[in-house]
Amino acid sequence: MTDTATSKATVERPKLQSTGSLHSLFKNVDLFSENDEELYPPLQHGARFAAPIEDSTLLALGMKPDELKAFQKQRHAYINKDQIYTDEIKIPNKTEMVDYHQLHLVSPIDQSNASRLLNKLVVIKLNGGLGNSMGCKTAKSTMEIAPGVTFLDMAVAHIEQINQDYNVDVPLVIMNSYKTHNETNKVIEKYKTHKVSIKTFQQSMFPKMYKDTLNLVPKPNTPMNPKEWYPPGSGDIFRSLQRSGLIDEFLAAGKEYIFISNVENLGSIIDLQVLNHIHLQKIEFGLEVTNRINTDSTGGILMSYKDKLHLLELSQVKPEKLKIFKDFKLWNTNNIWVNLKSVSNLIKEDKLDLDWIVNYPLENHKAMVQLETPAGMGIQNFKNSVAIFVPRDRYRPIKSTSQLLVAQSNIFQFDHGQVKLNSKREGQDVPLVKLGEEFSTVSDYEKRFKSIPDLLELDHLTVSGDVYFGSRITLKGTVIIVANHGERVDIPDGVVLENKVLSGTLRILDH
């Protein structure tokens, strides 16, 4: 990829969004209206009395000793799981939180020490998933977010610029799953001439279980069927990294910290201010959280449970209990800073005990069980853990074509692998974009936009139905476009729509 800017890569604090004070996020939260009530749904009767699985059975399936140990531990915890009760939930203590706005005061940066500090860092990108949510069958990291530019290109470009500007060696490590490993290893061949050391490793594979019995889906001595297995979440990174030998290798090379993030989060760049704080305050585990907004529905919130920081995945909560958390505003970005020596010790002492989440996929009309661990749940395992409240700039995930449209528009500018808000846009917020199901896959999305509209002055866009956009279109303010069932709406080339509602008959109304 090519960047036109020649300025030094930015690792200092980015321009902050107006997110308000940290304290203001907790106003009027009533935590104790439903004392002593369980949050999680109960197990099916058969699963509650599931028989143990012999280690020999798992070994016969090809599982490694540390994999089967982790799987057995999770399965046992699932059957005998501890409930979370609302009367134990509290707002995180101020001593467990730090506001990004205050880092330069709490932990001032010594710029003369920047290179030495960066040389202690390893960047790890989580690359286990395919782009299924957008209709792609390849590794999500290989998706284009700009003409000829992929998520992986962005990560490499950013780290390469840091290495050049500071004369350091920050390596890029990619954690793949069995779904992405071979493809990614082929793709990274193109970066051989770049000033970035790239390493990959493959995370564990766990067997699916039947929901009603918790019996294994795959059978020993049969051909491996990928549909009967799954990657057990981002929390598997710690054990898989240890198994790969990379933790010991990096410790021997003088590395002290790892910065973990999702490959599709365009905001997860190296931040020297955060790294400096982690270093000076001797933090073992730092989790970046941000202000939760209306579109944040699938993910985790931060709370204090039994006087420890705790990440709660909303997908695991009974639907009728979700209202308890509607005012919880600390949202997990999955940007995580970890002390390498600390995580190595926890693994060796078998004290890394991550909570899990459960998914119930359907295969051949039968409900399965997948037990997964988010990496952010490690926050409760480390002695000196902290949550860092960061601006939304550091959380730019691309999980849908709606987010892809914003990323590809003139709202943002690409600079050395970083995404920066266009200086010509007033304010710091990005527009709220909701594209209908007709745009849900990348192929359909690309068919429906002859070119990406000008969104520089857009606040809100909703598109529903069979809608096609021409070229050189400008959208401003609030624009709502609805094609009624059986009708098609074509937005002509060169049109400027500002605060308009377009119906299926192409009537244009002021909003």
UniProtKB/Swiss-Prot annotation:
The active site is at K399. GO terms for cellular component: cytoplasm. Pathway: Carbohydrate metabolism; galactose metabolism. Mg(2+) binds at K140, E264. Its EC number is 2.7.7.9. Residues 460-511 are annotated as: Oligomerization. UTP binds at L126, N127, G128, G129, K140, Q203, G233, E264, K399. It is an enzyme of class 2 (transferase). GO terms for molecular function: metal ion binding; UTP:glucose-1-phosphate uridylyltransferase activity. Induction: By cAMP through transmembrane signal transduction. One of its GO terms (biological process) is culmination involved in sorocarp development. Keywords: Magnesium, Metal-binding, Nucleotidyltransferase, Transferase. Substrate binds at G128, G129, N262, V263, E264. InterPro entries: Nucleotide-diphossugar_trans, UDPGP_fam, UDPGP_trans. It catalyses: alpha-D-glucose 1-phosphate + UTP + H(+) = UDP-alpha-D-glucose + diphosphate. Homooctamer. Plays a central role as a glucosyl donor in cellular metabolic pathways. During development the lack of the enzyme activity leads to cell death and lysis. Strains which lack UDPG pyrophosphorylase accomplish early developmental events but are unable to culminate. The enzyme affects the growth rate of the cells but is not essential for growth. Belongs to the UDPGP type 1 family. This is UTP--glucose-1-phosphate uridylyltransferase 1. It comes from Dictyostelium discoideum (Social amoeba). The gene is uppA.
